[in-house]
Amino acid sequence: MPLTYIGGDLVLTNNRSLQRLNGFGSLKHLGGNVSILDNGAIPEEPSDDNVIGFCKIKYYEMAGILDEEATVQLGRSTSLIDFNSLSPCPYEVVEDISGTFKAVPANRFLNSIGMNTSINSRGENVNTTEEIMRYLGARWIRTSVGGSVSSLTNLPETSLPGAGTSIASYKQLYDNAGIRFSAGLGAGGQERNIPNLINNVKRIIDATSPDAIIAIEGNNEPNNRNWYVIFEGEVGGGNKEGKNNWKPVARMQKKLYEDVKADPVLGKDGYNYPVWSLTDGGASGENVGLQYLKVPEDDMAVPEEFRGVTFADVANLHNYFNHPSFKFPQNNQTWRAAEPSTNVPPGCDVLYRHFGVTWLNKYKGYLTDEELEALPRVTTETGSTISDAVTEEMQGLLYMSLYLAQFAQGFDYTAMYLLTDRRDESGNQSFGFYDKFYNPRQSAHYLHNLTTILKDDKDIDEPGELTYSITGRTITVHDLLLQKNNGTFELVIWGEKYEGGSDRITVGFDQTYDEVWVYNPTKGTAPEMVLNNVNSIELDISNHPYIIEIGEHPESSVEDMKNDDFQIRAFPNPVIRNLTIYSDTEIGKVSLFDMMGNCVYTGRVYDKVYTVDMDNLPAGAYILSVLDESGNCIKKQKVIKS
């Protein structure tokens, strides 16, 4: 339990191991005096918006947690800090907002939500990929169709489930679920990979629609391990002989851009798909200008060969929010990772470190806030494994916040790494919304709830404006005004106070609304509150979103939404080990029958999520039967055990 109440004095003396004041983030009352002397490295002034130092005590005074008459001694017994001169920690400073704000189409936010997945290979199954993408409400997949240094990607026309990604795999996902794709060169490669990629993209378009492709992407992390490139016989990037020779990497990206733009289908005379930059350009071993989308003609630090060259239309990042140099928990963890300006959080792999001043060798690119914030930008990898610090619950909260923070700060697309855990490599076994047996994690349910509440299928023609204020807003409270195509406003307000505590805010409106619905995606898809004749709402904001809905609401009543929405999903299918059943209503009983009608499994549930262990059942076909609490059959489905 977090520490919330101290009735008397707070005395911390001669504790050399004490670092910061992280354990006091949730304190609501401090009844006595404060003496913190001769301790460890407690910062006097914070260097960023996360450090909990003596500024926390100043906040206690400002917020009334500490009596203004209390005696405060901080620092060293021989050299006290002037408490009166301290400022509150930046993340505690109240920054109220008030005004009339223009909405962004809700559909545009939903379109930004993407995944990294192998679709129908590496142990993944296209049928289940479709099912779980639908459940999550994710709209696009980052895919590689170029090949590698040693091989080309040859997409067959068709393939069996789990037997490799084919043109038919892309067609199934697009035709059935509207899923779109970015198409990348992949990790490593040679110049021959470029025409291979272009050909595969055109085959996908022929089988689906021009709308199925979002963009063409450059090489994946050419600084990494063996993901070097060979261009015209010369090795560049990676960690071998090309480590400090990035000219082949730049030439590869330059040729990709030129060939895509010159192609009659993909290029300027065709659908003119944007080209995304390669990733981790901030690790360039030499200054070849990859810190620019288009290299200025007058940047004499870049070789003449690359001056004036256009490498990409869009900046592409792998700005992981949980990184060895930016570890969880920190307040504003995902918000700071999405920072688009020169205000660089310590240790965070942000836009500036790849397109401002590169993190490895300090090559200079875009140096002003205006230049950086104007860059079109996407993220094609980010995420976090589960650990002692990042629990499954916390991962779910972070993933929701990540998509919101990225979009609110100008990222058009964000792909999480990963849709499901890898089955063929170590170290990546808990990134996924699903584990390798397709069991959903909390992150899957939370994202499902968020996208279901915001569900929309097209952009509103002319987004409207909403007048509102947020009082009591601190630096960890964020807002995003969305609007559905039917005119309904969805005001998303979320917090990133991951070190504990909450902020009581008041959302005020310039008029009284007959009915306002307030959703909490951690609780489900039905409104947590339905308020009538309201012009203000009080909320405690901590580490998850609330969604305030103004306008048209779902036609069903709240009670109907809770009890009459019989959407039952069972996946994966085919199943390897565990079959997970998720329902929007309470399940009473689950049974499995073989094809002879024999009951081979039955279980009482009384919950919305249930897992059937099919590991010991023979391979073959089974009939799944799901009953509600009253014994009514609400689902029958054929299930294949592989």
Language-model regions: role of each:
Residues 5-18, 31-42, 53-78:
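Concave beta-strand-loop units of leucine-rich repeat
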